[in-house]
Regions:
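Residue-level signal for inorganic ion chemistry
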Residues: 9, 20, 74
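Glycine-rich, Trp-frequent "lid" loop and neighboring beta-strands that shape
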Residues: 63-64, 104-151
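Short secondary-structure junction/hinge motifs that connect adjacent elements
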Residues: 27-50
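Internal helix-loop-helix
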Residues: 49-108, 112, 116-117
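An alpha-helix initiation/capping motif
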Residues: 10, 37-41, 88-95
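Short alpha-helical functional segments enriched in proximate histidine and acidic residues
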Residues: 19-23, 121
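Intrinsic disorder at enzyme termini
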Residues: 1-8
């Protein structure tokens, strides 16, 4: 097995490391932690501009198809910077689920909005006290206008 990074993978790592070094200092992170949202919407938009939110998504959805190695490289740099944005939960977990839906209409619009940095996604897969039993969900989704209310 060859564990050396390709030139493209090295460029991805170097670019992410440089971005976080220049735009994600310790004091900025501290201020974000104290803010109402707890993360930077500006950084989320920059991640979209850099193509990071499309990383690993199907090309037919407008994504950047690649192996999980590239995603792991980026996740390592998010960890190194102690980045607060929901990259793993939104872009990786939810993005990969929506990108692989057999019915593109089911998640295509949400995936597009996430890859453009206009929204963040959340995976509701556990509930307090459910003991990992998916047969009895307590969460109920009710249509409200253009969206849904989760209760």
């Amino acid at each position: 097995m060859d564990f050396n990074l390709t030139d493209e993978q090295q460029m991805l790592r170097d670019g992410a490391r440089r971005f976080f070094r220049e735009h994600y200092g310790f004091e900025q992170r501290r201020a974000l932690l104290a803010s109402e949202s707890g993360f930077s919407a500006e950084c989320w938009a920059r991640y979209a501009e850099l193509g990071w939110l499309a990383l690993g998504q199907p090309e037919e959805s407008g994504g950047w198809a690649c192996s999980f190695v590239e995603t792991a490289i980026l996740l390592e740099e998010f960890g190194r910077a102690l980045a607060l944005e929901p990259y793993l939960s939104s872009a990786v977990l939810c993005g990969h689920i929506l990108g692989r839906c057999s019915d593109a209409r089911a998640g295509g619009a949400a995936l597009q909005e996430m890859m453009k940095g206009r929204t963040r996604l959340a995976l509701a897969h556990e509930e307090p006290g459910d003991r990992y039993d998916a047969d009895f969900p307590g969460l109920v989704a009710t249509r409200r206008g253009d969206g849904s209310l989760l209760q």
